[in-house]
C-alpha cells in the first residue's frame, strides 16, 4: 500500500520541513531588505555628495564675488561711508544724510555722484559671475521712527512706502546711467527694488535700535546655490 499511495512523513518531520521552508523565506526577505537598504544608503550618500558639491561651489563663488568687490571698491568705501558684508554680499551705503532728505524719495546730488561712479563698476564685477547670480536686490531700510506719529503700525507702513519708493528711485536712476546701456537687459532681468521698512533695524551694543545706522540702502547679490540644492532634492 505504501508503494501505491506513498509513505506519509511523521508529524515531527513535517514540522521540521515547514520551519526549514519558513526560515528560507525569511532569509530571502532579509536579503531583499538588505539590498534595498544598501541601495537607499548609496542613493542618500550620492545626494549628500551632490549637495556638498553645490555648497562648496557656493562658498567658492561667494568668496570670489566678495574678493572681487573688495578689490574694486576698497579705496572708495570710506569716502562713500559704505561697507561690503562678506557673508551676505551686501554693498551697504550707511549715511542717510547723503542718501535722501528726511521722508523723501528723491536722491540727493552727492548720492547720485556716488552711484554714477559705483554702479558701472559694480556691473563690471558681476559680469564675471552671472552664472552664479539669481538676483541682485536693491534694498531700502528705515528706522522705526516716523515724524508726526507715535503709533508703531502707522510708522511701519509709512516707512514701508518710503523704503519702497526710495529703492525704486535708486533702480530707476542707475538704470538710466548712460554708460550701462549694454547691461540694461540684464539689469531688467536680475535686479529688484525691495523696501523693508523698519523690519531689519541695526542694533547697538546694548541691543537697542540705532536709528541713524538703520536708515540705509544696500545692493545685495543673491547666488543660485539654494536653487541648485532645491533642484537636487526635488529630483
Swiss-Prot record:
Primary location group: membrane
Keywords: Antiviral defense, Cell inner membrane, Cell membrane, Membrane, Transmembrane, Transmembrane helix
Entry membrane topology: Single-pass membrane protein
Entry-linked Pfam families: OmpA
UniProt-annotated location(s): Cell inner membrane
Entry superkingdom: Bacteria
Regions crossing the membrane: 25-44
Transmembrane among keywords: yes
GO biological-process terms attached to the record: defense response to virus
PROSITE patterns: OMPA_2
Residue ranges of domain OmpA-like in the record: 87-225
Any one annotated GO CC term: plasma membrane
Segments forming a coiled coil: none
Family: Belongs to the MotB family.
NCBIfam families: anti-phage_ZorB2
Reported function: Component of antiviral defense system Zorya type II, composed of ZorA, ZorB and ZorE. Expression of Zorya type II in E.coli (strain MG1655) confers resistance to phages SECphi7 and T7. While most T7 infected Zorya-containing cells undergo abortive infection, a minority produce viable phage progeny. These eventually accumulate to a high multiplicity of infection, leading to culture collapse by 170 minutes after initial infection. ZorA and ZorB probably assemble in the cell inner membrane and exert their effect there.
Name this polypeptide is given: Zorya protein ZorB
Protein species of origin: Escherichia coli (strain ATCC 8739 / DSM 1576 / NBRC 3972 / NCIMB 8545 / WDCM 00012 / Crooks)
UniProt gene name: zorB
Amino acid at each position: 500500500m505504501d508503494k501505491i499511495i506513498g509513505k506519509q512523513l511523521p508529524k515531527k518531520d513535517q514540522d521540521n520541513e515547514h520551519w526549514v521552508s519558513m526560515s528560507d523565506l525569511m532569509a530571502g526577505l532579509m536579503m531583499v531588505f538588505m539590498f534595498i537598504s544598501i541601495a537607499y544608503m548609496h542613493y542618500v550618500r550620492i545626494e549628500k555628495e551632490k549637495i556638498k558639491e553645490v555648497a562648496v561651489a557656493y562658498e567658492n563663488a561667494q568668496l570670489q564675488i566678495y574678493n572681487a568687490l573688495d578689490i574694486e571698491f576698497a579705496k572708495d568705501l570710506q569716502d562713500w561711508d559704505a561697507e561690503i558684508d562678506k557673508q551676505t554680499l551686501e554693498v551697504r551705503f550707511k549715511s542717510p544724510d547723503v542718501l535722501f532728505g528726511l521722508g523723501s524719495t528723491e536722491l540727493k546730488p552727492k548720492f547720485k555722484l556716488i552711484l554714477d561712479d559705483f554702479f558701472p563698476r559694480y556691473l563690471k564685477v558681476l559680469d564675471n559671475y552671472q552664472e552664479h547670480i539669481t538676483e541682485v536686490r536693491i534694498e531700502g531700510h528705515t528706522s522705526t521712527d516716523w515724524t508726526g506719529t507715535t503709533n508703531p503700525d502707522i510708522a511701519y507702513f509709512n516707512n514701508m512706502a518710503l523704503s519702497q519708493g526710495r529703492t525704486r528711485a535708486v533702480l530707476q536712476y542707475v538704470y538710466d546711467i548712460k554708460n550701462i546701456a549694454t547691461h540694461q537687459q540684464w539689469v531688467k532681468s536680475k535686479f529688484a527694488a525691495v523696501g523693508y521698512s523698519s523690519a531689519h533695524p541695526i542694533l547697538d551694543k546694548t541691543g537697542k535700535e540705532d536709528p541713524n545706522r538703520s536708515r540705509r540702502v544696500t545692493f545685495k547679490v543673491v547666488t543660485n546655490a539654494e536653487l541648485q540644492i532645491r533642484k537636487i532634492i526635488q529630483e
